[in-house]
UniProtKB/Swiss-Prot annotation:
Gene Ontology BP, a term: signal peptide processing
Organism from which the protein derives: Candida albicans (strain SC5314 / ATCC MYA-2876) (Yeast)
Subcellular location: Endoplasmic reticulum membrane
Record EC number: 3.4.21.89
Name of the protein this chain belongs to: Signal peptidase complex catalytic subunit SEC11
Pfam families in the cross-refs: Peptidase_S24 (PF00717)
Record-level GO cellular component terms: signal peptidase complex
Amino acid sequence: MNIRQQITQFLSLAYVFSSAFMLWKTLSVIANSHSPIVVVLSGSMEPAFQRGDILFLWNRDHQQKVGDIVVYEIDGKSIPIVHRVLREHHNSEKQLLLTKGDNNAVDDLSLYAKKQQYLNQKQDLVGTVKGYLPFIGYVTILISENVYFKYGMLGLLGLSSLFSNE
């Protein structure tokens, strides 16, 4: 393989990664969310959403209603949580939300940060669920939970880039 072919392969790979990054950033700006697409990681929202479903978020709603499904993050925890709004309180300055998973027996008070009784709509919410694709996100779960699958996928990607002729 000559140097020109190697440069072409590198540029093709760089093009794929930069296109994916640009698509992600475009979706982030349109949805007004740092994470416009999330994967359901647990069964707490069954039967509405199953583990492995991909959710599409929108964060341009000014007020959430009881029954809306929202994704939120808690300070100090890196994994976003998908749950339904159980109660809401608002005044002219902010909206406070209490959430609960459809498949959970109790509300999310124990999941919130210490001394936090409600979610702040502007600070804690990643977005409101507007659509989903069932089971497509299961690949992400397999990659994060199974080290052999992760290294196997990386190996296949590496081999395919080495042996491709384009």
